[in-house]
Amino acid sequence: MKKNFLNLLFTTALMLSANYSFAQYPNIPADVKKASDSMLKEAYHQSDIAWEKAKPIIAKEAGEGKPYIPWAGRPNDLPQSKLLAFPGAEGGGAYSFGGHGGRVIVVKNLNDSGPGSLRDACEQGGARIVVFNVAGIIRLKTPLIIRAPYITIAGQTAPGDGVCVAGESVWLNTHDVIVRFMRFRRGETFVGRRDDAIGGNPVGNIMIDHVSASWGLDENMSMYRHMYNDSTGKTEEKLGTVNITIQNSIFSEALDYWNHAFGSTLGGENCAFVRNLWADNGARNPSIGWNGIFNFANNVVFNWNNRSTDGGDYTAQYNIINNFYKPGPVTELKDPISYRILKPESGRSKLPYVVFGRAYVAGNIIDGNEKVTKNNWDGGVQLEDKKGNLMSYEQASKYFAAMKAKDPFPMPKISIIPTLQAKDYVLANAGATLPKRDPVDTRVVKQVSTGKIEVHPDAKPSAFQFEHRRLPGDSYKQGIITEVSQVGGYPEYKGTPYKDSDDDGMPDAYELKNGLNPKDASDASKITKSGYSNIEVYLNSVVPVSIVKPN
């Protein structure tokens, strides 16, 4: 109740303020900024306390072969496992260690912090595998900052309907992270905390699989770079995230409350973004935030407004292969944006003329546009001039000879299937489908299939309308929402905890069936002939490989 009152108070203060910015970003009143800064200061303070507790075990495990390398900026800066992160893992993050060989930590409650909470599990040091014996919504009061490396978060282990993280952002400020079958649905509109549902400063060896991220106030997910501070007083270095995969995930319905309904900013070195769905985000579907080779294949993009896939810079290289773009109700079919596959950027060039990176663009389908589907370069690759104005096809085509690559650029190993087959696969399998797909993803996927938007019967425009919004107050009818209430809010997530007598993350029934001792917690970490520990074998057994990678 107190938080809702503060939100109302801050929004009212903003409405009464005469000093609006003429950019797309709101002007934050001083009292709002003070409150936000105070909250973040306390969040960092609590994170620092947890970090100090974690450092001794991080140092100990570094001496045992699991070093902490926050300065990594090239793919070979980080050692990689000889084992796949899990069967079906692909791309640059396929050999992330995650929590392999570490202890098991069971999340037992939905609290923001304290023993048994997700935050407590994530803030601990050392290799760790986080499992769930609780279902429901975990409402974060402050950002969840994950700093210690070597962690696996296994949402598929939750009972019943599974878990959903809400209220604040999750920051992956480390390396060797595996996140599977998790929902990050932020859902807040407080102007002082316009942030992603999940993002942060990811270093590398990141594997994101079957994640559902939505209702972010900046983007739903950002993964492309990290800022490294060597503590010597030098300026922070901006380094690319290395060895990263985002696969089989859904990024939908970013909140447009502050004119910022953005899907994702992605990139990095040795990256792969494959078999994902971006739906009902006005822009950044996704945006390309780094100048390495951007590998984007077998994805589905639906119902964008002013931006589909764009970004990079004049040194970037792009593999844009076999993706399915479906304009939706908010997409202006008469405008070039409706058939845009890629808009590479040249803005960072200091040359007096425009210059663009090189691109392999092939096999992509623009639903309803036969011309661009037949030849992706016949209108699908769009360029801007030095003034930021969109070139005509005749103007842009003069640059194509230098831009167009005959063959794909080198990429990490991924399975690339025919575009329509990929579209069906994504709609059937993407997102946190285990322990079961929730009503949010079910509704979004249905919208992609039918092209029709579903809203709550009592949906109405937000009481406050940011004056610089591009879209009208009832844009939710076209799929671009400003508040979660317009689509019915959070669903219920129910589930009964399973019996786990030794608290090792494996249900007693599973242990008995597989010859393990349900009263001996130590067997969870024992390595099997497969190379995986018993707990990892259990995690993998829950997930059919057919929903991870197409046959």
Model-derived regions, located:
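Primarily auto-inhibitory N-terminal propeptides
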Residues: Q24-A85
